[in-house]
């Protein structure tokens, strides 16, 4: 991934001497609501490469320059080069990537037994990360529009990256928040997508039981220079006011929330999504969530029509720990159509049918899925007019 050097990138770089890292403090990335780009970000025609995208935003330049420096300094568990990538033949459009190192060297998952498990300070958490792993602190200026004051969020490298720019969005670690989605964390994730001028910067969340490996509140963010099926997949409304839709198309059925406007509409979306995830968590239903630029709800459309932001929520069977022997584990990116594969043999032999079979194993039984659907429809219907 070719990243231009930003003129002010030194603000987010570590000092030359390692001894100075801890004393440097965490730089703030300050932004305003006007910098959130709802329109004008599209996939380029032709090759799906960053070389053909519009100039990267201030956010992209800050993140990528700081992330690249940490890679050069050896703060990751392995160096990440260009990953072998293929689009699987078939109707879905799965993007498979070979990432052997992540499959071997990622941190072992914690002993999780419940979607509602409390934070345990004795387990690994983000208060224990090394100096230098934090890139910057996201800080939104408060404006006069009456929007909710956004809490500060740390942007931290994922030391076992699945793709370029793979970071974690972490609310103040000292609060000891368990892995349960909160509005402030989701807002930061959606706004990070809107701060990026790259159409392939995505954000996601894995619940406990949805393959979250650390029980300390965090979201994932990363770049993938490929379109994904969920960007333009068709949907059907579940609510007459268009507040909740269902994606029936492959890779997996899920619930779609969409907005094309910042401000109150975005706040309403965040509230709806978190009410839905609260319901799932309270009912011990594991779930995954994916945030991407995408098309409005409705009929299938060209995935180049990125006119707003899509938040897709998938309730799923709980899965605690990593399954060995599978080509990939099903979490936020796999449900969206991005398949990080663990071995060269699986990468060369993987088919669309095999990928769909692995994903289907993680979906709720039909009767339970229908119950969840009815509950979420009722939840949205109770929203204040």
Curated annotation (Swiss-Prot):
Q: Which GO terms describe its cellular component?
A: cytoplasm
What would be an example GO MF term here? Answer: hydrolase activity
Q: Which UniProt keywords apply?
A: Cytoplasm, Guanine-nucleotide releasing factor, Hydrolase, Nucleotide-binding, Nucleotidyltransferase, Transferase
GO BP term, example: glucose metabolic process
Its annotated compartments are: Cytoplasm
Q: What InterPro entries does the record point to?
A: GDPGP
Assigned EC number: 2.7.7.78
The record's active-site residues are: 218
Taking the first listed entry, what is the main subcellular location of this protein, grouped into a coarse class? cytoplasm
Q: Which catalytic reaction applies to this protein?
A: GDP-alpha-D-glucose + phosphate = alpha-D-glucose 1-phosphate + GDP + H(+)
Q: What class of enzyme is it?
A: transferase
Miscellaneous notes: The orthologs in A.thaliana are GDP-L-galactose phosphorylases catalyzing the first reaction of the Smirnoff-Wheeler pathway, the major route to ascorbate biosynthesis in plants.
**Family of the protein in this entry:** Belongs to the GDPGP1 family.
State the function annotated in the UniProt record.
Specific and highly efficient GDP-D-glucose phosphorylase regulating the levels of GDP-D-glucose in cells.
Name of the protein in its database record: GDP-D-glucose phosphorylase 1
Q: Which organism is it from?
A: Bos taurus (Bovine)
């Amino acid at each position: 991934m070719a990243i231009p050097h930003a003129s002010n990138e030194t603000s987010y770089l570590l000092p030359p001497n390692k001894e100075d890292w801890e004393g440097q403090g965490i730089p703030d990335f300050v932004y305003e609501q006007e910098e959130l780009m709802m329109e004008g970000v599209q996939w380029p025609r032709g090759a799906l490469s960053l070389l053909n995208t519009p100039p990267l935003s201030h956010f992209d330049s800050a993140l990528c320059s700081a992330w690249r420096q940490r890679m050069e300094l050896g703060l990751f568990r392995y160096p990440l080069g260009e990953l072998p990538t293929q689009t699987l033949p078939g109707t879905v459009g799965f993007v498979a990537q070979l990432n052997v190192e992540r499959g071997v060297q990622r941190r072992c998952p914690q002993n999780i037994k419940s979607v509602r498990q409390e934070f345990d300070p004795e387990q690994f958490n983000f208060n224990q990360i090394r100096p230098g792993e934090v890139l910057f602190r996201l800080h939104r200026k408060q404006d006069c529009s009456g929007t909710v004051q956004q809490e500060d969020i740390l942007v931290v490298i994922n030391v076992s990256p699945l793709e370029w720019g793979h970071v974690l969005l972490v609310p103040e670690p000292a609060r000891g928040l368990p892995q349960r989605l909160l509005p402030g964390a989701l807002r930061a994730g959606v706004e990070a997508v809107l701060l990026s001028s790259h159409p392939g910067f995505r954000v996601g969340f894995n619940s406990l039981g949805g393959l979250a490996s650390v029980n300390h509140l965090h979201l994932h963010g990363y770049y993938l220079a490929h379109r994904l099926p969920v960007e333009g997949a068709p949907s059907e409304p579940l609510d007459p006011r268009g507040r909740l839709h269902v994606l029936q198309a492959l890779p997996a059925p899920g619930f779609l929330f969409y907005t094309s406007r910042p401000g109150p509409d975005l706040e309403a979306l965040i509230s709806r999504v978190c009410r839905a995830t609260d319901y799932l968590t309270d009912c011990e239903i594991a779930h995954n969530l994916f945030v991407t630029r995408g098309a409005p709800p409705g009929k299938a459309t060209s995935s180049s029509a990125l006119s707003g932001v899509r938040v897709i929520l998938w309730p799923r069977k709980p899965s605690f720990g990593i399954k060995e022997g599978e080509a990939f584990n099903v979490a936020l990116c796999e449900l969206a159509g991005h398949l990080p594969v663990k071995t060269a043999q699986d990468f060369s032999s993987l088919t669309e049918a095999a990928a769909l079979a692995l994903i289907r194993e993680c979906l709720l039984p039909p009767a339970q899925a229908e119950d969840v659907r009815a509950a979420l429809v009722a939840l949205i219907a109770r929203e204040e007019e």
